[in-house]
Amino acid sequence: MSDRQAALDMALKQIEKQFGKGSIMKLGEQTDTRISTVPSGSLALDTALGIGGYPRGRIIEVYGPESSGKTTVALHAIAEVQQQGGQAAFIDAEHALDPVYAQKLGVNIDELLLSQPDTGEQALEIAEALVRSGAVDIVVIDSVAALVPKAEIEGDMGDSHVGLQARLMSQALRKLSGAINKSKTIAIFINQIREKVGVMFGNPETTPGGRALKFYSSVRLEVRRAEQLKQGNDIMGNKTRIKVVKNKVAPPFRIAEVDIMYGEGISKEGEIIDLGSELDIVQKSGAWYSYQEERLGQGRENAKQFLKENKDILLMIQEQIREHYGLDTNGVKAPEDEEGQEELEF
């Protein structure tokens, strides 16, 4: 053994003695290097994300204009986590969560942890406590724009508080990022958009809360309404475009188009028809849609209704789409920790 190797071994032993076993290791020594995921609740979004869902132990930012479907996207993720037996928490800084709508999306509201904090500091401290417990699989913060610093709440209306929220987010994310990775918790931050004053060229839109969230996020999703979905003169929902603006775990800039129906959330039938047609799993002849020898219906809405009534055919098409994109049909679960759900050491 060379002197350099002996010196390195001694340094590694010293680090492990001081900071604990596993504090430093060779990258190839990790037992499972695959990124563990949770399905997003939308097959189109799972394929756009490139790994079959949201990566565990990472920060996700979902932003877009008002009423574009940001909270709907987050609630679908909560429903998926709960279906896998996981624990979910929703920090409602906007004080606007509709439990009836959440239930319609498949969220078990009896098991969902809900907090409606008074200040931004309180919201982020609650989020940190939940993450550090190691017992929560997903935490949703709705929204960053509503995380008002305590100094601003206690001050007068006209007072200037320049950069307070950005400083709060920067400090919180420095503390949270390591804990989120260690506990394998998915942290979804919902954000609004603002317009910068005096921008003549380029995109004037920005997100509140400073730049820290942009840096710490592994995935950033931009949610926008593309068009209204009508049945006769009645508006039934919106065609929504979700763009993966940033992705550290797969190639970015992919786009998922989904139907968000009022009172129902993301239409699984709509995205199955669209993805199936793209891959020629579902055949389209004129206005008719068919699968193998089975006619699904004339027109997209009739085909959606047929799949809603015939779940076995829906699941068969879904499985073929997942196989084509190399996605796990059941979603990938995080490896079980030997210590179970005991509080993590940080």
UniProtKB/Swiss-Prot annotation:
One Gene Ontology term, aspect cellular component: cytosol
Top-rank taxon, per record: Bacteria
Alphabetically ordered keywords of this record: ATP-binding, Cytoplasm, DNA damage, DNA recombination, DNA repair, DNA-binding, Nucleotide-binding, SOS response
Binding site for ATP: G64, P65, E66, S67, S68, G69, K70, T71
The keyword Nucleus belongs to this UniProt entry's keyword annotation: no
A Pfam family this chain is assigned to: RecA_C
Transmembrane segments: none
Function: Can catalyze the hydrolysis of ATP in the presence of single-stranded DNA, the ATP-dependent uptake of single-stranded DNA by duplex DNA, and the ATP-dependent hybridization of homologous single-stranded DNAs. It interacts with LexA causing its activation and leading to its autocatalytic cleavage.
Family indicated by similarity: Belongs to the RecA family.
Protein name as it appears in the record: Protein RecA
Organism from which the protein derives: Bacillus pumilus (strain SAFR-032)
Gene: recA
